Each structure stands twice: as C-alpha cells, then as structure tokens.
Amino acid sequence: MTLRTHIATTADGVQLAWTRTGRGPTLVKASNWMTHLREDVDSPVWGHWTRFLSTHFDYVRFDERGCGLSDRQVEDVSERHWLGDLETVIEAAAITRPMALLGISQGGASCLRYAIAHPERVSHLILYGGYARGGLVRGGRHAEHHRAILEMVRLGWGNQNPMFRQVFTARFVPQGTHEQLDWFNELCRRTVAPEMALRLLEVRSRTDIVDLLPQVRVPTLVLHARDDEVIPVAEGRRLASAIPDAEFVELESPIHVLLAHEPAWREFERAVREFTGVARDEARPQGESPLTPRERRLLDLLREGKTNAQIAAAVFISEKTVRNHLSSVYRKLGVANRAQAIVKAGARAEAGTAED
C-alpha cells in the first residue's frame, strides 16, 4: 500500500500528519491512542484495520498532536483541541460531501463533538471501544486502576527494559501473539515520548461528555468488546443508551484493539459495512434488504420469545423505537407479523443463511 503523508496546521500552529488511502465513500478516523501513520500499515495490530477501511472507503486518518508523525513537542494537549484538530484535517482533505466518522477509544469523544457541531457533514457515526467518562471520572475501582497505570507510565515508559510498557500492552491486546505484543511494546516507545504519554493519558482520564450525548442527531453505531479490559463495556452501553436511536453491537472479545484472527473482528467488519451501506452481501436473496446489526439483534430476541418491553431493556432503547425497528424487520423479511418473522428467521438459521 502506497502511503503519502500530508501536513495540516492547526490554529495554534501544531502540524498534524495525515494520510488518505482507498476509494469509495469517505470515512475519517479521529486520532486515538496510539498510532503512527507509517508503522500502522504493516502492523500486526493495526494493519488489518487499515486494509479493511481502505478497501471499502476513501479512508482518512491522522496522528494526534504529540504522537507519531505529527508534532511531538507540543505545549497544549488539552481536550479542547480534539475537535479543532479533527476539523483541521477534514478541511485539509477537502471533503465536501457528508462523511462517515470512526472514533476508536477516546477518538469517539472527538467524533461526537464534531457530529454535534456539524451534523449536516456526518452521514454515519461509528464508535468502537468508546466512552463518555474517563477513568478518573468513573471513580471507585476504575479511578484507582487508572492512577496505578499513570504511575507506571511515569516511572517506566522510557526505559529500555519494556517491563512497564508490557503491563500497558497486556491490557490492550491480552490474547496477542508474541509478535503482536512485541510490536505494540515497540510502538509505545517509538510513537510518543514518556512525558507526552503521561500528559495524554491524564487528559483522557478526565474526559466527561455525558451531557453532550443527547445532542447527537446523526445515525450512530456503537460497538464494544464485551470483556474489554481497557474500557468496560458498561461505557459503550452508556453511549448507546444516551445517544438518540443509536445501534449497539456487543462483540465477543476481551481485546480493546480487535485482532485479525478474532470472530469479533469479522463481526465488526460486517456491522460497519452494513451500517454504512458498502459491500452488501452478494448471496442475499434478490429483493431482500439487509438487516442492520440492531435489527438482527432484535430478531434474535424475538426468537427467544422476548416481549417488546424486554427487548427495549436488553438493547437500551424505548418500546416505541423497538416497534419502529420491528416494522422495518417485517418489511425487509417480507412478513406481516411477529410470528411470521420468527418462522422466517428460524428457517434462515437452519439453512445457514441468516445474515451470513
């Protein structure tokens, strides 16, 4: 993959490195911990993300201030710059049509702020492993854990001995191979200086945008690994329940950065493709529209015999929204009611064609 990097300069003079790969509808990924434009392409941790997104989208990404190929020595890395930095890159990329935004981990906060400020420019909002409250804001055990991580970063990030960084790496990719763990350890060292790593983590730990979530007015897909050790799945559910009509997909994984070999990664790919409307399943019967991840989840709950109230509680939406989604499911399946939908779903599952 040919990588051409560009530089965009922010209002306060920080130079941000960004790149563009692939063809298709535009998708912009906000910066997240931690990336390096040049290293990520062939990375055993981030490479499959880049390949997937570049295959289906005009994919724009950038390194955040203080990291990677962007300016490494920066005075101000406060949260107030997250929106402005994203706006700077989007302007530099000369994106004129509505685009999809992808926010991974704390990148979700940047995307949420952008979607609220510029709803007319956002066609789809995708949040993976995101949160509205940083570790210190969540309090209790989460705050204690986060303080311990900050102390380890302060003591050992820059050491040649990777012991301290390995603790950090093990949280992000707990089931990684030796190659993946070694690569992530080295990424930590090469991407960000010790002092900057501590500053960036401290800023993230104090994030609190809970009050902004009801202001989102764009189609939103929230995905989260069920046993994520970095950001608890409860934070993903909080996002989905507070953002109006957001879809929520819970992935069977303990890994914050999904790895290529995981079934959860394939589910992530499928959910993103279907949510954004790219690369529809060619094997789908003619005339049958694809179900969204949420619609598939509702159909599964129907087959379990759940009532509308029970479904609403399970996926954190109102009963009215459940009825609206079920009407869409019936229409797409070509059935008239709940009973027919259950029969149709059962037949599809037995035939091995249920949305696969």
Give each language-model segment a name.
Residues 112, 116, 123-155:
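Flexible "cap/lid" loop of the alpha/beta hydrolase fold
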Residues 281-327, 332, 340-356:
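Helix-turn-helix DNA-binding segment
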Residues 216, 222-224, 228:
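Short beta-strand/loop motif that positions the catalytic acidic residue
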Residues 158-203, 212:
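Conserved alpha/beta-hydrolase catalytic His-Asp/Glu region
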Residues 7-69:
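Conserved HGGG/HGGXW glycine-rich cap/lid loop of the alpha/beta-hydrolase fold
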Residues 45-51, 61-102:
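Active-site loop/oxyanion-hole signature of alpha/beta-hydrolase fold enzymes
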Residues 246-286:
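Catalytic active-site module of serine/aspartate enzymes centered on a nucleophile-bearing elbow/loop
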Residues 227-231, 257:
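Acidic catalytic loop of the alpha/beta-hydrolase fold
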